[in-house]
């Protein structure tokens, strides 16, 4: 795969998703974002999209399996899932066509916009809109962004900020949303050769180390307060946004 041999890629996937798993264990999201950011140092963004999908799917399956009140989450957030799946089924077929630079630019710009609005003290949780409408709107945005970049946590985060949920509920629900989105993305990526058969062995290695990292991150998360939790999210997103925008315009 590109200029890397098997050992190199197994090593890169192991280290990358161990780090990504720790971040996901602490803040509930961030595994695909971290994975993409690190992998893009070694492979092009389109290849990174394919390698990213299997660790993302397995880690979020594990995250939702360990969630509280899974049936209640499914019932409460069903409209978000319907919306995200519908849009992902469309957008995931175009990831290979738009090019590596545009993938980086779209994602980095969206993340930076989110960080800026939060830094200006816009209180998302004070927005009063019917929840069903919010679910369809943010589910659709997640689907549009996620199919192209494989990174759909940003609209999910804004939606859950509006809901002003606890850190534990944030982790449980975001895991459910991302897991449900993985299935249509898998179909789109596999059909367009973004995800190839060769990638599965590397993806499974990444998934294994992501679960180890996730376990460690969970232990750290237990002592984090809600305000600190949100600050960690913003710091994390700022770093990723700058990196992706730089890649889009200067690589």
Residue locations for each model-derived region?
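Transmembrane helix exit motif
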Residues: 62-69, 92, 97, 106-130, ...
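Small-residue-rich segments of transmembrane alpha-helices in multi-pass membrane proteins
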Residues: 37-46, 81-90, 114, 135-147, ...
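Selective hydrophobic functional segments
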Residues: 51-100, 183-227
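Structural signature of hydrophobic alpha-helical transmembrane segments
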Residues: 9-10, 40-57, 101-111, 140-150, ...
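Hydrophobic core positions of alpha-helical segments in small-molecule transporters
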Residues: 51-54, 79-83, 106-109, 172-176, ...
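A helix-boundary/kink motif common to multi-pass secondary transporters
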Residues: 32, 44, 99, 103, ...
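Selected transmembrane alpha-helices and immediately adjacent juxtamembrane segments
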Residues: 1-42, 124-174
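Juxtamembrane helix-boundary/capping and inter-helix hinge elements in multi-pass membrane proteins
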Residues: 41-45, 67-73, 161-169, 192-196
């Amino acid at each position: 795969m590109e200029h890397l041999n098997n050992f190199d890629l197994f090593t890169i996937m192991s280290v990358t998703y161990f780090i990504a798993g720790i971040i996901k264990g602490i803040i509930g999201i961030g595994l695909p974002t971290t994975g993409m950011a690190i992998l893009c140092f070694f492979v092009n963004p389109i290849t990174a999209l394919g390698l990213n999908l299997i660790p993302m799917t397995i880690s979020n399956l594990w995250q939702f399996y360990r969630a509280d009140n899974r049936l209640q989450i499914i019932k409460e957030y069903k409209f978000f899932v319907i919306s995200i799946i519908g849009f992902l089924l469309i957008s995931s077929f175009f990831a290979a066509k738009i090019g590596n630079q545009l993938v980086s630019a779209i994602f980095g710009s969206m993340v930076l916009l989110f960080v800026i609005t939060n830094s200006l003290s816009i209180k998302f949780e004070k927005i009063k809109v019917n929840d069903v409408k919010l679910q369809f709107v943010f589910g659709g945005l997640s689907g549009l962004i996620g199919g192209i970049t494989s990174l759909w946590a940003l609209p999910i985060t804004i939606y859950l900020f509006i809901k002003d949920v606890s850190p534990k509920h944030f982790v449980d629900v975001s895991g459910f949303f991302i897991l449900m989105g993985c299935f249509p993305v898998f179909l789109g990526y596999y059909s367009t050769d973004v995800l190839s058969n060769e990638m599965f062995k590397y993806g499974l290695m990444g998934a294994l180390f992501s679960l180890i990292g996730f376990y460690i991150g969970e232990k750290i998360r237990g002592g984090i307060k809600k305000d600190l939790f949100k600050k960690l999210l913003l710091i994390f997103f700022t770093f990723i946004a700058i990196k992706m925008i730089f890649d889009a315009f200067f690589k």
